[in-house]
Each structure stands twice: as structure tokens, then as C-alpha cells.
């Protein structure tokens, strides 16, 4: 048979050689070298590291292949095996001695299946791992023995992938040629690498056999052998798989880097306040770019500094991002999400706050109502803590009383008492009248829009004058009922329990008019009345339940702390499991001591509590950061001048938070131009070792109010001689601070004028200097006097005298009408006509 026209357009026949080699080297993990050898009229197909196939009668083949993957190469080997199997068939062997066959191979160059004849050549192997393969198979068979390979060999081009399911050989009976067709796809581009595998077999009529052997694959050929290509007249070297793979990886990285460098614009969620670092992370921008944008707005900030939402929005927009505002405070909405319906509201006990001036009988009144003796337990006989009590009345009704201190230092406590109350009972002593704290209580009640009920106490006193008190109330827009107004006024005596029943009736009447109701089935909420730290029980908070029912095990938020309610104790020191609206109770279980006046609320779970507390802490920090950032120039100058002041360092420890707050407020009112009071640490609890360490390091004084010192701290304080002061009455503590500040003040200097002298002559004395000859015109001049030298009514010197002489003798005093010699200390610019005034300096201890 003849092949189709080759590239020159001519017909060409190929002779069957005695030996056929399949390729030179195949670069894959599985196939290292593939070739055929002739053994005694048999053909052996040997694939190193793979398998061996032998046949006594086979068909000469030549395969040009471009291999992309190992699987595609395996398909080529499968094709060769099928060709060899056909060579063993009876039909082929019957005709093999009398004919020569040519297997024509076509190369598809276009999609319209145009073909050309391709001459057989020695194999050239090239491999491209990311492009499709092409194959051309051309076989020629002619019976001949021991012939060499034809030297007329040219490269084979554009061979495509073979499909394994198509027939490879077709048997044509009574014909002198056999055609092997392959499926050929489109030609590859110029960058494709051709892999040519030459397959030649020796055709004999002997019986065929298949031999499979395993070859040792341990020897790995060198790259120079594996990738060596054969050309018609010279050898050349191509790139290795590793090099191609590195090049492809480099290209991929380049594409990825280009994708990364392409800026992505985002929708940035910005809360009320945000740090510079967090803003940069949310925008995926460099910190340097964000800082530069801030500088353009005239803002100098570090990465941890907080900026407001408006500034953050300007930065985000300037960098090309869109902005979506959100509020972190949304987490607290769960505390107010449920609303009470009218049907869920039930009557509750009124909450009464007792207010008035100190020593007007507020606590004594509560003792009389509760039949207790609280006042005897108060230091100095005055109330220094806010207290809450529940009084059960004979008619199965109850009233909750809140007792507030009357001392001026406890203004904040009275303010809180007015805010949580329903009715203010203003206690005024009939023998003392309206005082400053009485007026303050009236103002607090009016500010809180709380009705006032006046109780004129001590009507049993000899000098009591209730009518005078009623008339004095008119000056503060409080008009009693008997004077035509709406304010209930009840004269009482707490000490002798006079008219206490009338006071209770007036309270209940006013409460009925207010229609006080609450929902007992809701989640509990209320207000912190007082808080403290106990060395055995931990944090204890006195709270007033204003809504819902508080139970043991509830998750409670109080200020910046939260916790599970472990125990509840009522005002009678009894442990209870439930607290209903208007009930005051002490609770244990909070993680952090709350401030008096903080709101408390029960939440569903610990996760909600933690998110709310984290928000509150973060908000407080951001507000502090903004406060520091927005400090004015005047404040900076004030701080700079404050550094020149003397400093009194204090550490304050109290039993409850209300007392701590009152003492700090009172100390801050002690202001002067020389001494600055610095409270290094103020907390609730006993004096501990860390307080001692801080006091020693800063030379501070520890002030303890109704607290003690623990044993470890006591030993350390005694060893280091730490200054610790203990007080149980707020008056004494404030007086000590004032005294300490006064002791640090510079004494007051007084100049007492004593006399005047006129300079009438100046004498230059060797080794002494200038001596002024003076005449005392007024008063007297003493040796220890301070003098001022005046010239043209201007002071040119002020200082002590060096010597005072009368003639040549030293003297202590020279009186008016006498002459004397005066030498000034280290000053010699004295002229005739100058005036010397003498005065005595006296010091007086400064007081606040």
C-alpha cells in the first residue's frame, strides 16, 4: 500500500526494518525509557519501571505524540498494545509472508480535516504540561530481516491526543496493505512541544508470545538524557519539567499579585466611636494611609486613639469606601425591649425617701416606725449611709423607706434618693427651722418632680414653733394645706411617737392618689442604693427592686459588672428567695462592685450580660480617650502650673460606696493656690497590702473610713512606718485633710515698718566697702531689721543689714534724731540722698 501524499506531495513507501525503537526517553514518574528489541524472531516491548510486552509477529509503527499528562501517555501505550495484539492474529500471519503493508497516518491541520502525508523520522520528544496533545500514527510494513532503520528521517508535527475507545487497526482481507487510523484533533500552537515515539517491529511468521517482566526503576536518568531531542542533523536541549513548572508558578504568582494589588472598595460599618487601628482593619487599608488621611483633616492621632463616627466616615469616604453607621448601644435595647400592658400592672408599695437637715430626726423617725434602734449604731449619732427599710402596717399594707444622710457631704446620696422615690418626706425640726440641707432637699425633690410631704419633728421640744416652720416654707413655694395649699404637713414627735399614725395615713393617701403600680411578672430591674465589699462574702449591693421579681439564680447586670444572684437578704437580715417590686434587698454574686445609683436589670443569659458590660466598659474608655484628646491649651497650662504646686497624696478606703463618693466630693472642694490634693486610690474595702505598697512608693497617707486593716498589711505598715489614719465620722476626716493642707501652705509674711533714715554721706573703707552715713528721720532702725533702699521713690535693693554702728561701735538700735553708719549686705551702689526704710518681718501660719 501507499501512503497519502506527504509534505512534498509525493507518494512514499517504507520498508520494514529488523529492529524498531520506541522513542528515546519519556519524562514521567512511571515511564523512564521505552523501546523494542528483537530476540529470536520475536519483538519485545520494554517499558522501564512499567511492563514488558513480547510478540513474534508485530506491526511496525511510528507514533508522534505531544504528551500533556501521564494518563494520556498511558493511552498511547495501550494503543501500541492493541497494534501488537493484531499482529499476532491468525488472519494477519496468513498473509504476512507475501505482502508489505503500509499504515498511512494523517495529520489534521484544520477543522475541515485537511490532511498531508508525513514522512517517518527518528523520534523527537518534547513535553508541555498545560496544553492538549496531538498524535499522528503512520505505519509501514514490509517483510525484511536484519535491515537497519532508514536514514531518511524528518520531524513529525502537530500530533493530537488519541481517543482510546476508537478502533486502531482494520483488517482488510485479500489486500496488500493495512491501514491504522487515529483520531486527530486540531493542530497545537507553535509553543506546543512534540513528543515523537518511534515504534518499529520485526514481522515474522513464527508463533507470537507475550512476555511481561518488571524492570528495576531505581536508576533515574539524567535530565540531559531525558529531555534530549533529535533533529534531522543535530541535537538540541529543551527546558525541563521543573523549569516549566517554575515558570508557570511564577506566572500564577504574578497574576495573583496583580489581583491583590487591585484595590477593593468596601461598605464599612462604623460605630459611634472607633479606634484608628480598627478603622484601618475594617477598610483593609494601610495604617499609614489612614494616618495620612487624618493629618489632612488636621488630626494627630495614634493607632489606639478613638475617633468619633463623623471623622471616621470622612476618612472612609476619602479612601473610596462607602459607610454604614451603626450604634453599639443597640445591645442595651434588650433591657427595654419588653413593655408592660395595663393588665399586667398590679399595685405596689410606695417608696418614701426621708430627707432633711442633719440632726433633725430622720433616722429617729424611721426607728420609731420600724420599732428599731438604728440611730444608736451610727457613729456620732448621724447617718452616713443610705439605708432602705420596709415597714409593714397593720392594715396589710407596707411602705418602703429610704433614709438619706443630712450632712452636706452626702449631697449625691440625697440626689439619688430623690430619683428613685415616689414621695419625699421632708423632716424639719420645729425648734431649728429650715436649714441649708433642708433647702437642698426641697430642690432635689422639685428637680425629680416628686411630691413632698412635710413632717415637722420635735414638736415636744420646749422651744418648738411649728407655725414658724410653716410660714418659712412659703418662701420656697411650699404651701401647707391649712394655709390654702396642696402640701400635706404633719406635726410629729419621733422620740415620743406622737402622730406617727397620722403620718402613715398621709403617706398612704398620697400613694393612692399616685396609683403606684408595677408588673411583678417581668424581668426584674431596679437601682443600686448602696454597695460595699465584705472580706468574707465579697461584693454586696443593696438594691431597690422597681419592676419584676428578682429570684435566686437570675443573671443580673449592675453598672459595669454582672453575676448570678447567689443570696438575697432583706432589711431584717433574713435570707429570701424572691424580691418583689418596692422591696429593698442585699444581693451577693456580682463580679464587680457597682456604683451607688447604677441601674440593675436581669437578662436572659450570661452571653447577653457580657456583651452589655463589654459595651459599657468600651464606651467609658472611648469617652476618656476623647476627653484626653480634646484637652484645651488652657487646661494644659493649668496642668503645667499644677506641677509646681506642693502635693498631698492620699489613699482613701471606705466601707461603702456612698461614703466613698461623699468623702471624695468633700476633699475635692478643698482648693488653694499652693497645695494640690491628689487622691491616688479610692476604693471600698479593707486596707490591704497593695495599699501599703502604693503609700510607701508615693509617700501618701492612707485614710480609712469605717474600715480596718488586714493582718498582712498591718505587719508591713508597721515595718515601713506607713502613715494611716482611721475615722468613723466624716467631719473628723475632712478636718484632718484641711489641717494637713494648711500645714503645707507657706506661712503668711507680714512686714512691720519701724523707721526711716536718709543717706547724707558715703564712705569708702578699705577691705570693707561702702558705708552709708545716715540720719534717722523717723522711728528706729534695729540690727536685725530688713531694709529697702529707695532712689527716686523706687526700690533698688531689699535685704538685710550687714552692720549697724554708732560712731565706731556696733549697736542694736538707733532711734530717731541720731546718726549711724549702715552697711548693706553685698550691695554697694549707695548715693547721697538715698532713703533707707527699715521693717521687721513676722510670719503667720496659713489656714484654709
Curated annotation (Swiss-Prot):
**Location of region: Disordered:** 106-150
Where does it localize?
Answer: Cytoplasm
Polar residues: compositionally biased ranges: 112-139
Top-level lineage group: Bacteria
Could you tell me which PROSITE patterns the record lists for this protein? G_TR_2, IF2
Q: Which GO terms describe its cellular component?
A: cytoplasm
**InterPro entries noted in UniProt:** EF-G-like_DII, IF2_II, IF2_N, P-loop_NTPase, Small_GTP-bd, T_Tr_GTP-bd_dom, TF_IF2_bacterial-like, TIF_IF2
Q: Where are the stretches annotated G2?
A: 381-385
* Keywords assigned: Cytoplasm, GTP-binding, Initiation factor, Nucleotide-binding, Protein biosynthesis
Q: Where is the tr-type G domain?
A: 347-517
- One GO molecular-function annotation for this sequence? GTPase activity
Stretches for region G4: 457-460
Record field: transmembrane = none
Where does the chain bind GTP?
356-363, 403-407, 457-460
Query: Which Pfam families does the UniProt record give?
Result: EF-G_D2 (PF22042), GTP_EFTU (PF00009), IF-2 (PF11987), IF2_N (PF04760)
Q: What does this protein do?
A: One of the essential components for the initiation of protein synthesis. Protects formylmethionyl-tRNA from spontaneous hydrolysis and promotes its binding to the 30S ribosomal subunits. Also involved in the hydrolysis of GTP during the formation of the 70S ribosomal complex.
The Swiss-Prot or TrEMBL record describes its family as follows: Belongs to the TRAFAC class translation factor GTPase superfamily. Classic translation factor GTPase family. IF-2 subfamily.
- Any idea what this protein is called? Translation initiation factor IF-2
Amino acid at each position: 500500500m501507499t501512503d497519502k501524499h506527504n509534505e512534498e506531495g509525493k507518494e512514499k513507501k517504507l520498508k520494514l526494518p529488523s529492529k524498531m525503537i520506541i522513542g528515546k526517553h519519556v519524562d514521567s514518574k512511571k515511564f523512564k525509557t521505552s523501546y523494542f528489541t528483537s530476540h529470536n524472531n520475536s519483538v519485545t516491548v520494554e517499558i522501564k519501571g512499567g511492563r514488558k510486552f513480547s510478540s513474534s509477529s508485530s506491526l511496525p509503527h511510528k507514533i508522534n505524540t505531544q504528551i500533556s499528562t501521564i494518563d494520556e501517555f498511558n493511552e498511547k501505550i495501550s494503543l501500541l498494545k492493541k497494534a501488537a495484539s493484531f499482529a499476532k492474529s491468525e488472519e494477519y500471519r496468513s498473509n504476512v509472508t507475501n505482502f508489505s503493508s503500509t499504515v498511512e497516518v494523517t495529520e489534521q491541520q484544520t477543522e475541515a480535516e485537511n490532511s498531508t502525508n508525513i514522512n517517518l523520522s527518528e523520534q523527537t520528544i518534547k513535553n508541555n504540561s498545560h496544553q492538549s496533545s496531538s498524535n499522528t500514527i503512520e505505519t509501514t510494513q514490509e517483510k525484511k530481516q536484519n535491515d537497519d532503520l532508514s536514514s531518511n528521517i524528518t520531524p513529525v508535527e502537530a500530533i493530537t491526543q488519541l481517543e482510546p475507545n476508537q478502533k486502531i487497526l482494520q483488517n482488510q482481507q485479500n489486500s496488500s496493505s493495512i491501514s491504522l487510523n487515529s483520531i486527530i484533533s486540531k493542530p497545537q500552537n507553535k509553543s506546543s512541544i512534540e513528543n515523537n515515539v518511534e515504534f518499529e517491529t520485526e514481522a515474522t511468521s513464527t508463533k507470537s508470545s507475550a512476555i511481561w517482566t518488571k524492570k528495576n526503576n531505581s536508576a533515574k536518568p539524567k535530565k540531559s538524557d531525558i529531555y534530549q531531542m533529535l533533529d534531522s542533523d543535530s541535537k538540541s536541549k529543551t527546558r525541563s519539567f521543573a523549569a516549566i513548572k517554575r515558570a508557570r508558578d511564577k506566572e500564577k504568582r504574578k497574576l495573583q499579585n496583580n489581583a491583590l494589588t487591585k484595590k477593593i472598595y468596601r461598605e464599612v460599618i462604623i460605630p459611634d466611636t472607633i479606634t484608628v487601628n480598627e478603622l484601618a482593619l475594617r477598610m483593609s487599608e494601610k495604617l499609614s494611609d489612614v494616618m495620612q488621611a487624618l493629618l489632612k483633616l488636621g488630626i494627630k492621632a495614634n493607632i489606639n486613639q478613638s475617633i468619633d463616627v463623623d471623622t471616621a466616615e470622612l476618612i472612609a469616604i476619602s479612601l473610596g469606601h462607602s459607610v454604614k453607621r451603626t450604634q453599639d448601644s443597640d445591645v442595651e435595647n434588650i433591657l427595654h425591649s419588653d413593655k408592660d400592658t395595663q393588665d399586667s400592672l398590679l399595685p405596689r408599695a410606695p417608696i418614701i425617701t426621708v430627707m432633711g437637715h442633719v440632726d433633725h430626726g430622720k433616722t429617729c423617725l424611721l426607728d420609731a416606725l420600724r420599732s428599731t434602734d438604728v440611730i444608736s449604731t451610727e457613729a456620732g449619732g448621724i447617718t452616713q449611709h443610705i439605708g432602705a427599710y420596709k415597714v409593714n402596717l397593720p392594715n396589710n399594707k407596707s411602705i418602703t423607706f429610704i433614709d438619706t444622710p443630712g450632712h452636706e457631704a452626702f449631697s449625691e446620696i440625697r440626689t439619688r434618693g430623690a430619683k428613685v422615690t415616689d414621695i419625699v418626706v421632708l423632716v424639719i425640726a420645729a425648734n431649728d427651722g429650715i436649714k441649708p440641707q433642708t433647702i437642698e432637699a426641697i430642690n432635689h425633690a422639685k428637680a425629680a418632680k416628686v411630691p413632698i410631704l412635710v413632717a415637722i419633728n420635735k414638736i415636744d421640744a420646749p422651744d418648738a414653733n411649728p407655725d414658724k416652720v410653716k410660714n418659712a416654707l412659703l418662701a420656697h413655694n411650699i404651701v401647707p394645706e391649712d394655709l390654702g395649699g396642696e402640701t400635706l404637713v404633719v406635726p410629729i414627735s419621733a422620740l415620743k411617737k406622737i402622730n406617727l399614725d397620722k403620718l402613715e395615713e398621709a403617706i398612704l393617701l398620697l400613694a393612692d392618689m399616685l396609683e403606684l403600680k408595677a408588673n411583678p411578672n417581668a424581668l426584674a430591674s431596679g437601682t443600686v442604693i448602696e454597695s460595699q465589699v465584705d472580706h468574707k462574702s465579697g461584693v454586696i449591693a443593696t438594691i431597690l427592686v422597681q419592676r419584676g421579681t428578682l429570684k435566686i439564680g437570675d443573671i443580673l447586670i449592675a453598672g459595669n459588672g454582672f453575676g448570678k444572684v447567689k443570696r438575697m437578704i432583706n432589711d431584717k437580715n433574713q435570707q429570701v428567695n424572691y424580691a418583689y417590686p418596692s422591696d429593698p434587698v442585699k444581693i451577693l454574686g456580682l463580679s464587680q462592685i457597682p456604683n451607688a445609683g447604677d441601674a440593675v436589670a436581669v437578662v436572659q443569659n450570661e452571653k447577653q450580660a457580657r456583651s452589655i458590660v463589654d459595651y459599657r466598659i468600651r464606651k467609658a474608655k472611648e469617652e476618656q480617650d476623647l476627653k484626653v484628646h480634646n484637652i484645651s491649651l488652657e487646661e494644659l497650662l493649668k496642668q503645667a502650673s499644677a506641677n509646681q504646686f506642693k502635693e498631698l497624696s492620699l489613699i482613701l478606703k471606705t466601707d461603702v460606696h456612698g461614703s466613698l463618693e461623699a468623702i471624695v466630693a468633700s476633699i475635692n472642694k478643698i482648693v488653694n493656690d499652693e497645695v494640690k490634693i491628689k487622691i491616688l486610690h479610692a476604693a471600698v474595702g479593707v486596707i490591704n497590702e497593695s495599699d501599703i505598697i502604693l503609700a510607701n512608693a508615693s509617700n501618701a497617707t492612707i485614710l480609712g473610713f469605717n474600715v480596718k486593716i488586714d493582718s498582712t498589711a498591718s505587719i508591713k505598715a508597721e515595718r515601713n512606718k506607713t502613715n494611716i489614719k482611721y475615722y468613723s465620722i466624716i467631719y473628723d476626716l475632712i478636718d484632718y485633710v484641711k489641717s494637713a493642707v494648711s500645714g503645707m501652705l507657706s506661712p503668711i509674711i507680714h512686714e512691720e515698718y519701724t523707721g526711716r533714715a536718709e543717706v547724707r554721706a558715703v564712705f569708702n573703707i578699705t577691705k570693707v566697702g561702702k558705708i552709708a552715713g545716715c540720719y534717722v528721720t523717723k522711728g528706729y532702725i534695729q540690727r536685725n531689721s530688713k531694709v529697702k533702699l529707695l532712689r527716686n521713690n523706687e526700690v533698688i535693693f531689699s535685704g538685710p543689714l550687714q552692720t549697724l554702728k554708732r560712731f565706731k561701735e556696733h549697736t542694736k538700735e538707733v532711734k530717731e534724731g541720731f546718726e549711724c553708719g549702715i552697711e548693706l549686705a553685698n550691695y554697694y551702689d549707695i548715693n547721697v540722698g538715698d532713703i533707707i526704710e527699715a521693717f521687721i518681718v513676722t510670719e503667720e501660719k496659713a489656714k484654709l
